[in-house]
Amino acid sequence: MNTHPQTSPNTHYKIADISLTDWGRKEIDIAEHEMPGLMSIRRKYASKQPLKGVRVTGSLHMTIQTAVLIETLKDIGADVRWASCNIFSTQDHAAAAIATSGTPVFAWKGETLEEYWDCTLQALTFTLSDGTLTGPELIVDDGGDATLLIHKGYELENGSTWVDEPSDSLEEQVIKRLLKRIAIERPGYWTRVVNDWKGVSEETTTGVHRLYQIAATGRLLVPAINVNDSVTKSKFDNLYGCRESLADGLKRAMDVMLAGKLAVVCGYGDVGKGSAHSLRAYGARVIVTEIDPICALQAAMEGFEVTTVEDTLGQADIYVTTTGNKDVIRIEHMTAMKDQVIVCNIGHFDNEIQVDALNALAGVQKINIKPQVDKFILPNGNTLFLLAEGRLVNLGCATGHPSFVMSNSFANQTLAQIDLWQNKDVYEKNVYRLPKKLDEEVARLHLEKIGVKLTTLTANQAAYLGISVEGPFKPEHYRY
């Protein structure tokens, strides 16, 4: 962990090492050639400037691929500030390149929880020409932390007592302390932020789940676009991205031979599907756990054994959580696992695994092997390896998804930001999805790069199907 991040005199950035700029810029240049969707959007909208002067905060993994997203948003007019959405996911050379280009960025690999939430606050803090502190007009969120902080801050200013209630986790304690501090240092700040805030686009399953929960209670403060459930996000980033990046994270962390190992994948949604197929492709024997009978049946029809975590204890070599739920792997599971077991998460938050309970287990011995790899010697003498402290293994122990698949996701994010701003007076405070036509367009932008040639419908064929020759080609309810 970098305990002394570098800060510019005018708080323009807070990163690990500005000298990494050249390395970061070289990798950004490579990524641009692998991200045809984003680059096409950049060319299309650069002259139109649809986000001209719009204050945009990003809370999303500060990677090389995200750097291309940031520079696309800037090229179409946005005034951008950025933080990572995970304490381990920042690529420090990417952050350096973005800081050098003039974008305020607050992110480094190995932040503490206090540093992480302070970085989120700094990314949310814009200063008007008269010196007034305000917030963003749009947010690009990943996991919903920026959205959560604004909602909790606003609710505190309007009488909520949540900050004084018992906390479920250490991270919740950190959030509450931050909100109490801001209430003293910046009275009325969150109300000013909400007055200017026009919308949020959310990247992940976990963040979308949060949005729907808030909307169901009538407390959602702005319109939100669910980017995660765009087909060109969920069926590509979640599935094909995880199919490549999970194994990358495991191998960089442990140098482990996957062939012949028994691996348990908890969850068989899109992320679980990609993870299970990745491990099987490497020769691992894969067991899936599921709560949903449809997903369980899918896994079984793909040839995976489907059972419970409890039935695998003492046998499996690797456990991977992919669910977006909490307490999927509990302390009683970990103490019953076989010696030398590897436990990791590729869902979103670290609460999929009871990490706090593992750290607090009486008689446990914790040994750090290297960054994001911890060895726990349990009271029974068995050893358990926990990767990335239970946070995202593909970003904590490797570099996340490849550029090409992230171009799909980030093209959706950019289009969502444009849509939110153009329709800020139309959208109500609800959760929306991008229309099918835009989803298809995102896919179309990536075809030439991989040598795909589409068949074109004749007018008669289109009429027979009851669709336009140009699409959309599927109804909204179609399941890809």
UniProtKB/Swiss-Prot annotation:
Function: May play a key role in the regulation of the intracellular concentration of adenosylhomocysteine.
Reaction catalyzed: S-adenosyl-L-homocysteine + H2O = L-homocysteine + adenosine
GO cellular component terms attached to this protein's record: cytosol
MF (Gene Ontology): adenosylhomocysteinase activity
Co-factor(s): NAD(+)
Keywords, sorted A to Z: Cytoplasm, Hydrolase, NAD, One-carbon metabolism
Binding site for NAD(+): 204-206, 238, 267-272, 290, 325, 346-348, 394
Gene (UniProt): ahcY
Protein name: Adenosylhomocysteinase
Predominant subcellular localization, coarse grouping: cytoplasm
EC number(s) from the headed UniProt entry: 3.13.2.1
